[in-house]
């Protein structure tokens, strides 16, 4: 097309090298490039790996991690919002809020802590420090019995400081830091070994 406002690409993962599952995950990505059309044409039919972006990520040594958290199902207001337990002699339950709001306006506001869905939320963790990355063929970091709930890493890996949202095999999306912090940039870590 000669005239276009924006170009976005649809990419899919290659689950076979990781041996986690059979069906690929599909995602739509936006592109930042002066000439988007020629950049997209150069990518069609090619595998995009993490190593293609290591030069630009090495400038920051930080990544933003997007993903869906672990699902906890329906849970009460104490676990969901952390409200305090009421006195043991209180009426109509200890693990409920004492009041769900005023008489008027005559509806319950969204701010009232009530039972409902907890977890399986889309979340972004900003400024995770990138410690190291590599391939298993170059350096084997697998524990003897593999990682808990995951197994052994077969292809490539990235080690990040801190915890990452979601269960072991759920896909996550790494992106450049939107608001990189200077303190996180300055801190330096050296990878020794993994203890499980």
Segments predicted by a language model, with ranges:
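Extended basic (Lys/Arg/His-rich) segments that typically form rRNA-contacting surfaces
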Residues: 1-74, 79-196
């Amino acid at each position: 097309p000669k005239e276009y406002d924006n170009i976005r690409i649809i990419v899919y993962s290659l689950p076979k090298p990781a041996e986690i599952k059979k069906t690929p995950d599909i995602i739509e990505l936006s592109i930042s490039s002066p000439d988007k059309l020629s950049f997209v044409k150069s990518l069609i039919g090619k595998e995009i790996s993490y190593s293609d972006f290591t030069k630009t990520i090495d400038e920051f040594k930080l990544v933003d991690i997007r993903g869906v958290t672990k699902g906890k199902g329906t849970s009460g207001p104490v676990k969901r919002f952390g409200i305090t337990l009421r006195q043991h002699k209180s009426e109509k339950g200890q693990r409920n809020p004492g009041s769900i709001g005023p008489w008027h306006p005559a509806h319950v506001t969204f701010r009232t802590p009530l039972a409902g869905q907890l977890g399986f939320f889309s979340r972004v963790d900003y400024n995770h420090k990138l410690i190291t990355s590599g391939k298993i063929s170059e350096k084997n970091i697998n524990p003897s019995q593999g990682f808990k709930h995951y197994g052994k890493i077969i292809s490539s890996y990235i080690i990040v400081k801190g915890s990452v949202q979601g269960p072991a095999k759920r896909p996550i999306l790494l992106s450049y830091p939107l608001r990189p912090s200077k303190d996180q940039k300055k801190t330096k870590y050296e990878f020794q070994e993994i203890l499980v």
